[in-house]
């Protein structure tokens, strides 16, 4: 069975041939050997030779392995390696050595451009099959988010978000949320992540906060509000698409920071309404986003593709320094929201304040004690999000008892 077919056919008589896969004209810029690698990868995913559909995690690993192996292939076969000192090579003039260094650097830059182009070609070719995967819960979560935004409980959540009470600010955030519609027309991870980055930047500009008040704490609150203003659909699917299929080695620290902020905001919103969760196919114990790719640390080889115990692909740890700042900022946001919960639920019953105390210490205390931000693992953000989920449930459970 094909990995990417959302339907289950009874007969598979015609196996697609690699020569039947036509790449776009833009692929002509790639070396012929690289084009062959791209066609072979696409064929491996659409050919009916596999026993079952790939899970989102397995498919993400397949893409990341493909990116990794293609990058290594280009580097080893198309880029001349620097000569070893032990090799017998003719002496060169300084000008010749400098020219060789420049030529090699040009090829390295060209390799990165090729890798971006390869990602675009593969993801756009397979977009209808890999966006909002049938083996994932993306569609159910998108529907849950849409229902929440259309419900009255959205207003209750907005009232608990610590943002300035400024009508002009909220109007600007409504306008910023319109930028999310561009995601529906974009079919590559690069284009989608650029939209998320644009929205993130626009939120900062719309806040018009003084520089000393412009931090990740206020950004998270404004991001939550901006998402609640978005009347569209598939926002979770768009975010998961980026996290699954964007080349992990090409994600900058700023981009990871941006994606983590949207992940935290969406997770908080999805956990804010237990009533809707009980009416959906998603159980309250489920991870709302299941962004497994963002929590990965190591990569499996192609031979371990079907092994569920295999380690996922690597994260560039050097680009995670911004997560420490995010942890510090979310720490303050957590305390602020907890205070609002306590004030909100105190009117409910005499023992409501005791119910708030079980939340315990602020999230991810070790974020404040780590000496080197490069020691942080992006998977640790799950612990922070779980505290937000618990806090959101507490807020609306108490609100429902009033």
From Swiss-Prot:
Its main location: cytoplasm. This is Vacuolar protein sorting-associated protein 9b. The gene is vps902. SUPFAM superfamilies: VPS9 domain. One of its GO terms (cellular component) is cytosol. Keywords: Cytoplasm, GTPase activation, Phosphoprotein. PANTHER family: GTPASE-ACTIVATING PROTEIN AND VPS9 DOMAIN-CONTAINING PROTEIN 1, RAB GDP/GTP EXCHANGE FACTOR. The keyword DNA repair does not apply.
């Amino acid at each position: 069975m094909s990995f990417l077919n959302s339907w289950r056919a009874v007969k598979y008589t015609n196996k697609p041939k690699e020569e039947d896969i036509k790449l776009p004209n833009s692929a002509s810029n790639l070396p012929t050997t690289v084009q062959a690698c791209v066609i072979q990868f696409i064929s491996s995913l659409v050919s009916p030779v596999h026993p079952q559909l790939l899970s989102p995690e397995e498919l993400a690993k397949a893409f990341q392995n493909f990116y990794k192996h293609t990058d290594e292939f280009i580097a080893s076969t198309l880029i001349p390696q620097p000569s070893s000192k032990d090799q017998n090579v003719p002496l060169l003039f300084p000008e010749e050595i400098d020219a060789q260094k420049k030529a090699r650097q040009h090829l390295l830059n060209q390799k990165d451009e090729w890798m971006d182009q390869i990602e675009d070609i593969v993801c756009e070719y397979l977009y209808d099959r890999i966006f909002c995967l049938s083996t994932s819960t993306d569609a159910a979560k998108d529907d849950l988010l849409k229902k929440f935004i259309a419900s009255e409980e959205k207003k209750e959540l907005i009232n608990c978000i610590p943002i300035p009470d400024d009508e002009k600010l909220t109007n600007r955030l409504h306008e910023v949320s319109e930028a999310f519609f561009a995601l529906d027309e974009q079919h590559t991870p690069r284009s989608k992540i650029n939209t998320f980055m644009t929205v993130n930047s626009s939120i900062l500009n719309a806040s018009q906060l003084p520089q000393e008040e412009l931090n990740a704490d206020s950004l998270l609150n404004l991001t939550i509000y901006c998402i609640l203003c978005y009347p569209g659909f598939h926002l979770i699917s768009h975010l998961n698409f980026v996290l699954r299929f964007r080349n992990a080695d090409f994600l900058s620290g700023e981009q990871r920071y941006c994606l983590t902020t949207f992940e935290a905001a969406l997770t908080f919103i999805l956990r804010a309404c237990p009533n809707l969760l009980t009416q959906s196919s998603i159980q309250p114990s489920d991870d709302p986003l299941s962004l497994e790719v963002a929590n990965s640390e190591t990569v499996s080889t192609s031979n371990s593709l079907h092994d569920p115990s295999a380690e996922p692909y690597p994260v560039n740890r050097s680009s995670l320094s911004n997560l420490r700042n995010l942890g510090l900022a979310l720490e303050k946001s957590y305390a602020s929201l907890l205070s609002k919960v306590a004030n909100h639920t105190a009117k409910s019953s005499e023992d409501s304040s005791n119910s708030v105390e079980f939340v315990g210490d602020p999230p991810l205390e070790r974020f404040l004690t780590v000496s080197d931000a490069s020691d942080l693992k992006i998977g640790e953000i799950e612990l922070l999000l779980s505290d937000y989920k618990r806090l959101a449930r507490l807020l609306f459970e108490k609100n429902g008892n009033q």
